[in-house]
Amino acid sequence: MGHGLDAGLLATVAIAAYRNSRRDDLDLPATLVAIHTALNAQFNGERFATAVLAELDLASGLLAWHCAGHPAPLLLRNGRAVKTLEGGRGLPLGVGVTPEIAEERLEPGDRILLFTDGVTDARSSDGEFFGLHRLTDLVA
């Protein structure tokens, strides 16, 4: 998404579309379409945003999600990273919309780690990437 005024405007449009979708009680696929449509209407396909949209049913523990050009979340269980939550992948919002939704049943105590590629792509002074392995070691 970037930084500065353009990024702020992009985020404002995306968040407003998300909030309107929630008020209208839209499901996850329809919410993705609404955000994509709002970004396209405002920016004519010249700007985009990555995101993870997710919904957790607390009664059943069912997590549904879609990664719109964003790194996949990590499932943390019993103090360790169990797996990357693959599936539900699509293009960044504003570029295209493929509202594929993935699901995973969570167990009590599970945690979901959402992060940006800015974390995993960070480099040390020696040029070494921080990477996904270090991130999971840090948080698990």
Labelled PLM ranges:
Residues 1-6, 11, 15-140:
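Conserved subregion of the PPM/PP2C metallophosphatase catalytic domain
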